Amino acid sequence: MAPRGCAGHPPPPSPQACVCPGKMLAMGALAGFWILCLLTYGYLSWGQALEEEEEGALLAQAGEKLEPSTTSTSQPHLIFILADDQGFRDVGYHGSEIKTPTLDKLAAEGVKLENYYVQPICTPSRSQFITGKYQIHTGLQHSIIRPTQPNCLPLDNATLPQKLKEVGYSTHMVGKWHLGFYRKECMPTRRGFDTFFGSLLGSGDYYTHYKCDSPGMCGYDLYENDNAAWDYDNGIYSTQMYTQRVQQILASHNPTKPIFLYIAYQAVHSPLQAPGRYFEHYRSIININRRRYAAMLSCLDEAINNVTLALKTYGFYNNSIIIYSSDNGGQPTAGGSNWPLRGSKGTYWEGGIRAVGFVHSPLLKNKGTVCKELVHITDWYPTLISLAEGQIDEDIQLDGYDIWETISEGLRSPRVDILHNIDPIYTKAKNGSWAAGYGIWNTAIQSAIRVQHWKLLTGNPGYSDWVPPQSFSNLGPNRWHNERITLSTGKSVWLFNITADPYERVDLSNRYPGIVKKLLRRLSQFNKTAVPVRYPPKDPRSNPRLNGGVWGPWYKEETKKKKPSKNQAEKKQKKSKKKKKKQQKAVSGSTCHSGVTCG
């Protein structure tokens, strides 16, 4: 029992009232303990304080200032971040050795998309995101849009930013376009974006922003709206440069007005370049390409952290939806990894088309979850328009679905199939034939389709090995360890149950011919809706040497009319004489009779 006067709650005592001789030693020990706790807390919080100080300094350098948070608009701010060539394994939460703390945190607090598909190469994924249509419905089903081709996303397609502008959104694009630019009408600012800062091609040097398509075909590839951004020819690394522009856009925009930000980073596409400080954590990676790739991805992860911080700083975050996606699978020869999936970028195996993706937003109802429902990149078009309270014209046939309730509430996806593609030009399967397709489909044609659990591939799907991460491979940058499978001679059809066999190791086409026939018929049905392929030959007028050293619009319509030939001129003269005679007869024959006055 405590001595009287040292327990309870008496009236305020004198300073010595509760100093009891029996407690002096204990109080001294307690004071020492509290001092130790304070020192420990100060040490542990030092790292966090430094991090916050660095973030504050970064924003200050960008000319930004703190503003109160406000959410007066019912329409959410939409931020779509597209990475380039990021492999399925190349994120921390998929087991990668590459550090991605920002992506891991955003995904963990949001919804991870673990059954999410894109296209195997750049242009098709970007076109499907911005139109909500499969590439067979835009004519872009073969390869990519080359910088020397007179080609671009068809102008009769209403784009996502155009639809968002209709309902009051400010629309901005930063980064890689890669949807064609041969005419001014094809440029991002003519396709719905209020502002554009980035590259038209997207695979040039990260510092100089120059791109060579072939020997003698080189030019500068950085634009500010419709003009070359020569002021930025100063050696700034593109990932950091694009992030600074995003910060500036957010700093100058009123958060009570809805904004759509399309941030299409160049990273981690080759060439493999990164600032030196990002290599520090990866000295143990022996493979040089993998090490460079890891440094690039760490820089990208930091950039996305800075974008997220800017959203919070300027009052956008609480009413924002952040969507993160890769545009296609990784390229193992350039440091990427899709392990344990089969194949790589440019193929229709899972490694080429199954992507890293997640949604992060305070507006999500089910945060911290994993979505295993079928989702495709075309789905963002109707989903974002619906979230923006916009309307889709009834006569527009989309291939995407509104999947917000699937993501936010965990409901079933309205999507049951995906047409990965039909490329009628790519027919390199030597043994493909109508007979192999049961008379339903020519299996020489490269195609792939997913219907519920089943996936069918025909033709030549592309490089088919399983390639483990090359971190500790010492074979050199141009060689890599892989697990190879020898394709059966004469093979042009494959069938997999992707739910049971996501790594595509067991071909079931011979076991289930009935399912093969059903999927071939579905391919045939899709093909009946396809538009002609747009893949024109090169145009020499595209050479940057003819356009001030810049990649940019070069095509001009022929406005001059041809002079008529002598025969054509004579015919025109005779026709005009006949017209004059008829007019004279009509006038002479218009005399009024019976005293009626002509009016």
Curated annotation (Swiss-Prot):
It is an enzyme of class 3 (hydrolase). Its main location: secreted. Keywords: Calcium, Glycoprotein, Hydrolase, Metal-binding, Secreted, Signal. One of its GO terms (molecular function) is metal ion binding. The modification 3-oxoalanine (Cys) is found at residue 122. Residues 531-599 are annotated as: Disordered. Residues 586-599 have a biased composition (Polar residues). PROSITE patterns: SULFATASE_1, SULFATASE_2. Belongs to the sulfatase family. This is Arylsulfatase J. The gene is ARSJ.
